[in-house]
Amino acid sequence: MEHYISLFVKSVFIENMALSFFLGMCTFLAVSKKVSTAFGLGVAVTVVLGISVPVNQLVYSLILKDGALIDGVDLSFLNFITFIGVIAALVQILEMILDKYFPALYNALGIFLPLITVNCAIFGGVSFMVQRDYNFAESIVYGIGAGTGWMLAIVALAGITEKMKYADVPAGLRGLGITFITVGLMALGFMSFSGVQL
């Protein structure tokens, strides 16, 4: 149990997808204007990561891994296309659920919801799972932890951005300039966790 808690904390803080690996920055920067929208997208990314990482782990270990189906047959060259297909299917299912049960969030996310399909944070989580050779239970914990870390980062950035509306930001830094500085400072803060041994 301690191993799974350690893996979760590590994936949220020490190896944060957005602030350590800078994955998923397109939606991270674009949807971080309001906390409510950022939280909704963060939950969507967490759900997709929490489902796609373990599902892709099963696909990889049972079908694509060297010798999984037949001894001597290595289908790992199909990793990228298979993982992207699984992620795309899961995002389509999530999009239909949000459209039916949460139409306000669906409309607020707009074009960024289908873009979760090509969000490199999702694919990065799946790739890290393969690279680190996580088992099924570890991939569940890692997927949820990585999504939670990404959500924590985007909600924190949205909160700071909302507060910055009342600040006197110099004209040359307004918009993306101050956002990049803020993200850099947040990344420095999260970097302080890198010395923690779990």
Swiss-Prot record:
An example Gene Ontology biological process:
sodium ion transport
Keyword Transport in annotation:
yes
User: Membrane-spanning regions, if any?
Assistant: 11-31, 35-55, 77-97, 110-130, 140-160, 176-196
Query: EC?
Result: 7.2.1.1
The cellular component terms of Gene Ontology attached to this UniProt record, alphabetical and capped at eight, are:
Gram-negative-bacterium-type cell wall; plasma membrane
Q: What class of enzyme is it?
A: translocase
**Topology relative to the membrane:** Multi-pass membrane protein
Q: InterPro entries per the record?
A: NqrDE/RnfAE, NqrDE/RnfAE_oxidrdctase, NqrE
Instruction: From the UniProt record, list the reaction(s) this protein catalyses.
Output: a ubiquinone + n Na(+)(in) + NADH + H(+) = a ubiquinol + n Na(+)(out) + NAD(+)
What is the role of this chain? NQR complex catalyzes the reduction of ubiquinone-1 to ubiquinol by two successive reactions, coupled with the transport of Na(+) ions from the cytoplasm to the periplasm. NqrA to NqrE are probably involved in the second step, the conversion of ubisemiquinone to ubiquinol.
Please give the subunit comment from the record. Composed of six subunits; NqrA, NqrB, NqrC, NqrD, NqrE and NqrF.
Similarity remark: Belongs to the NqrDE/RnfAE family.
This chain belongs to which protein, by name? Na(+)-translocating NADH-quinone reductase subunit E
